[in-house]
Amino acid sequence: KLSGNFEIGGQDHFYLETHVALTIPGENDEYQVWSSTQHPTEVQHGVGNVLNIPSAKIDSKVRRLGGGFGGKESQATIFAAMSALGAFITQKPVKIRLNRHTDMTATGKRHNFKVFFTVGFTTTGKLLALDIKLLSNGGNVLDLSGPVITRALTHLDNCYFIKSLKAIGYV
């Protein structure tokens, strides 16, 4: 039996282009939303929810997809919604381009973790049991904190069969 704890450092997504969103009002409550996102469908639904109009009236566009390292998966929706709300109110195009400092402080990160564990094994090293608690620092932005802790919990056994496993996670 072995017990202990350790920490895993977090990581900022450092994509080259900061978050950008441009919303152009159209006819019949339709909006064209250009966003630097990895998830145009989420932007479409998020903007529709904020404006309280069907997402079918939101034309979500992205010029280039990729290179965000996960940092533009859900976070871009926030800035697209801000741009869309401004365009909705003014009925004029509204563009938001974050500077690096604002982008880094306003968006989520790859979470740092503190891990507490007790592991049981045979004298030959065969893994028998694991009792583990994961503490994930979601920081000031929850965005993907739920999916991050879920993934950590469901993948922590990796390729091992652990007959007795108790895993708890907190954000």
Question: What is the predicted function of each stretch?
Answer:
Residues K1-V171:
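Structural alpha/beta core scaffold segments of enzyme domains
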